[in-house]
């Protein structure tokens, strides 16, 4: 079983990877766009749903709040969908004889790596949320147990002061 620190470390590494993929995708997209303008061919495929996913991943690893985890999961799903669409669009237009073939191949490779990263990040976010839920439940249970012990201790302290006691509505009251 992974600890919270290991999950957070893995999320940070994957988030940095996603940011790197996003920046690389933007660079490949910019080069591809400029070459497409020269050749008067349409440029398909977006660069970077992964950049946003990586930034949200770092925020999620730092904050660990429920809303940030939901935001990160949503970004991972959007990155996953964007990566799949990007791959499908590029696969449809890629011709091995095209001068843009190496750039399309690079974009498709980045999309595949990004899709894998988004999938693993989503899974790790679910693991982190589950771990945090168990931790909060354990803390709440410990707090309730501690407050119950303190109430029992207070009751026994009141009973042991030597004066006759009465129980009224769950409270110990002295008769004198």
Swiss-Prot record:
It is a multi-pass membrane protein. Keywords: Cytoplasm, Membrane, Transmembrane, Transmembrane helix, Tumor suppressor. The chain crosses the membrane at residues 11-31, 41-61, 67-87, 100-120. GO terms for cellular component: cytoplasm; membrane. It comes from the Eukaryota. GO terms for biological process: negative regulation of canonical Wnt signaling pathway; negative regulation of cell growth; negative regulation of cell migration; negative regulation of cell population proliferation; positive regulation of apoptotic process. It is found in: Cytoplasm; Membrane. Acts as a tumor suppressor in lung cancer. Inhibits tumor cell growth by inhibiting cell proliferation and migration and promoting cell apoptosis. Inhibits metastasis of lung cancer by suppressing beta-catenin expression in the Wnt/beta-catenin signaling pathway. This is Transmembrane protein 196. It comes from Mus musculus. The lineage of its organism: Eukaryota, Metazoa, Chordata, Craniata, Vertebrata.
